[in-house]
Regions:
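Short linear regulatory motifs enriched in tryptophan with gly/pro/ser
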Residues: 1-216
Length: 216
């Protein structure tokens, strides 16, 4: 699947934001619920938000992603993510690095509408993204920030919602014939409730973009 990123303009190091967007991100159809509350700079693009979601949730950013939301002006659904050569012509995906968050989330009348963030179209992970508003940034903090959360992110490529449920069930049963092999695949004991807020580390979205697309 060929990706077609537009050439991104070189950027100067970002200034400390004066205002931040606050989002609640929750992974659909998982038990226990996996969620994070984030604050990101008002200057962020959808690509930048994607990187913050990946890093806070614990995903490895090794699959395609897509934001699906209602366009406030045109009153239609739009898809924002990584354009590909085989995408639908009647519903193209807009490059996330070209769309600032302010394009869709700066209006009070629309901030409460949920957005869908899809990741890994094979496992089909769907996250509900709720814009909770905008806050004044604290001068002593570096953004993005993860304010709170719960639940451990499922392992990559575990088979989606059903595969994750099977993994938890087998790991929880030492007598299951696949217990040892599943433990080995998961890399050892897996606690679905585990979440260490202090362990969240955010990557630079500009470096992530360069690593993914600009390999010269």
């Amino acid at each position: 699947m060929a990706m077609r990123p537009a050439r991104r303009k070189s950027a100067t190091p970002p200034k400390r934001p004066k205002v931040v967007h606050q989002f609640l991100v929750a992974l659909n159809r998982t038990d226990p619920l996996v969620w994070r509350r984030l604050q990101v700079p008002e200057t962020y693009s959808f690509w930048d938000l994607h990187v913050a979601i990946q890093d806070s949730m614990g995903w490895l950013d090794c699959h395609l992603h897509e934001f699906r939301l209602l366009d406030a002006d045109e009153k239609r659904l739009v898809s924002i993510g990584i354009p590909t050569d085989d995408g639908p012509e009647d519903h193209p995906v807009v490059a996330g690095w070209d769309v600032p968050l302010s394009r869709h989330f700066a209006r009070p009348a629309w901030h409460a509408l949920p957005t869908l963030y899809a990741y890994d179209f094979g496992d089909d992970w769907e996250h509900v993204l709720v814009h909770e508003g905008m806050e004044s940034a604290e001068a002593s903090l570096t953004y993005p920030q993860c304010l709170a959360g719960a639940g451990r992110c499922p392992p990559e490529d575990c088979g989606g919602v059903q595969g994750y449920a099977d993994l938890r069930r087998i790991i929880a049963d030492p007598k299951h014939p696949e217990h040892a092999s599943m433990m080995d695949w998961a890399g050892g004991p897996f606690d679905p409730d585990a979440f260490d807020l202090s362990g969240v580390v955010f990557d630079d979205p500009r470096k992530r973009w360069k690593h993914a697309f600009d390999r010269k």
